[in-house]
C-alpha cells in the first residue's frame, strides 16, 4: 500500500485510514485524487508550527526587522515626510 513519498489515493484513505493516519502522525502524507495531489495530512504539532511561522500578526521590533526591509521602511517614511511637507 505505501507509495514513495507517503502518497495515497482517496480510495486508499477509505480502505486503510488507520494506517495512513498512523503514518501522518510521523510525517506529512499526501492524498491524491485522480492522480493529482489534493490534500496533506500532518500531525497537529507540525500544523501549529507552520501556522505560527506564517502568522502575519507576529510581533517584531525594529531591531528584529531584516536590514533590507528596514531600508525599505525608512525610505517609505522619508518619502511620506517629503510629500507631507510639500503639501503644506
From Swiss-Prot:
It comes from the Bacteria. The keyword Transferase does not apply. Keywords: Plasmid. SUPFAM superfamilies: YefM-like. InterPro entries: Antitoxin_Phd/YefM, YefM-like_sf. Pfam families: PhdYeFM_antitox. The keyword Zinc-finger does not apply. Belongs to the phD/YefM antitoxin family. This is Uncharacterized protein y4eA. It comes from Sinorhizobium fredii (strain NBRC 101917 / NGR234).
Amino acid at each position: 500500500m505505501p507509495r514513495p513519498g507517503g502518497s495515497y489515493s482517496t480510495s486508499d484513505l477509505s480502505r486503510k485510514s488507520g494506517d495512513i493516519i498512523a503514518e501522518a502522525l510521523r510525517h506529512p502524507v499526501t492524498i491524491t485524487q485522480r492522480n493529482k495531489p489534493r490534500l496533506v495530512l500532518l500531525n497537529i504539532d507540525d500544523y501549529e508550527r507552520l501556522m505560527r511561522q506564517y502568522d502575519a500578526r507576529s510581533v517584531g521590533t525594529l531591531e528584529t526587522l531584516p536590514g533590507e526591509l528596514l531600508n525599505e521602511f525608512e525610505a517609505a517614511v522619508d518619502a511620506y515626510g517629503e510629500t507631507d511637507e510639500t503639501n503644506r
